[in-house]
Amino acid sequence: MARNAKEHPSIKWGPFHARFPGVHLRLQPSLMIQGAFMLLATCGAVTPLVMQYFQVSFEVAWTVSLIMLFWVIAQTILFGDAYAAGAITAALPLTIVFLNTLTPGAEAVEGMVALFLVVIALFLFLGVTKLGAAFNHFFPTAIKAGVIMGAAIAALQSEIERLPTMPITLISAWVIIMLLMFSIPFAKLPDTKAKVMAGSNALLVSFIAAGLIGWLSGELTFTIEWGFFIPPIGETLATLSIWAVGLPSWEMILTVLPIGIIIYVFGFSDLLVANTLLKGADEARTDENINIDPTRSHYIVAIRNLGQLMTAGPLLWVHGPIWTGVQIFLIDRYKKGRAVMDSIYSGPMNFYLLAIPFGLLMPVIGIITPLFPVALSISLLLTAFACAYISMSMVNTNVSRGIALTIGFLTATLGPAWGMGVGIVLHLMLIGLKKEELTEKEVEGIKDDLLSRKTEHVG
């Protein structure tokens, strides 16, 4: 088939491309509504954690989440990346382990500001120098696998501790999401319309089912109020923004450096997966040329995290390049042709566009707020499951597996500094300085696992 592809129209500014809804990108209401509820429920999952660790009100925590959504959609509308933006979800369990070592309130805020700044600096420096691939390859595969295993252990540990608070609701949510996303017997069932619909919207189905079961069991209570949520912007800036809290100490920056490095490795791996997915989409359609620029993507992730600090303050999520499950879902639609999705850029725009307006409606807040613990639990459970199988697929010798598990346990219990430190010593003692040339296998393994699923958590 002859290829007559052009890049979608945009307003170019510097290395970026702005594409606005209704001007450059076609609106699709059904996609907007589905995306808004999924994004609010998933992104809002950390709102209770922001309240707990930063000692702020729900209003302030919710405002920070809404501003995060602005920077999420800005990736496509203002900066021109085709990725469905998200957060670096694998980092969340390690972030929680770190915050548990700090005093809730001012110290925890300082710690997260420091972590954001380290991640920003890494993405900027390695983007400008184009050394991201070399930096990522510098870490032996066994150590990377161990860090990812640490995220899995920490995530699963946190959910086991949370279980007694609402056992019926959480177990129901876990069973449904695991059945829809990972069950081999379920996958072998005939591809009926109901099965395809449930599998393609696994997060939404699990939220709705868990909400209904939780309400029937009395574990969840929904309070519906009418009106609009007025974000306390002034209070939020005065409480959490970098303008108010100031720069963290050098001691704190050095403390978070190992975690920041791990988060960058996670983020770079997300970019590898994202680029692989987009290249597949680009090959499937001959009517559009998808502009993939890893250097620009580094800049965008850095700008989004810096913008978060300057316009609101940190969350427990760190902005990342891709929400993998949504990206796969949107690419599946994109491959069906221009009649289904006009441009690769219109997918993320439509999926995210109504999230902020819906997040200002009190009835919507009343419906999704009780589901925050469920959304967080599902996100962490999926993170644990995905990180575990990715970690195990990266190592192919018994020694490497043993090192990975040791690093994972130490990372989850004592923190990333211990995990990486002991991991480096073990690697030198048991494997030596030789490189395990598994990078391509690692990427392909992740790609195959991701492409076999229709939807997944943030990041």
UniProtKB/Swiss-Prot annotation:
Membrane topology: Multi-pass membrane protein
Domain of life: Bacteria
This protein's record includes keyword Transmembrane: yes
Protein keywords: Cell membrane, Membrane, Transmembrane, Transmembrane helix
Compartments in which it is found: Cell membrane
Keyword Zinc-finger: no
Positions of transmembrane segments: 31-53, 60-79, 84-106, 113-135, 165-187, 196-218, 228-247, 252-274, 309-331, 351-370, 374-396, 403-425
Any Gene Ontology CC annotation: plasma membrane
Chief site of localization: membrane
Record protein name field: Uncharacterized protein BH0208
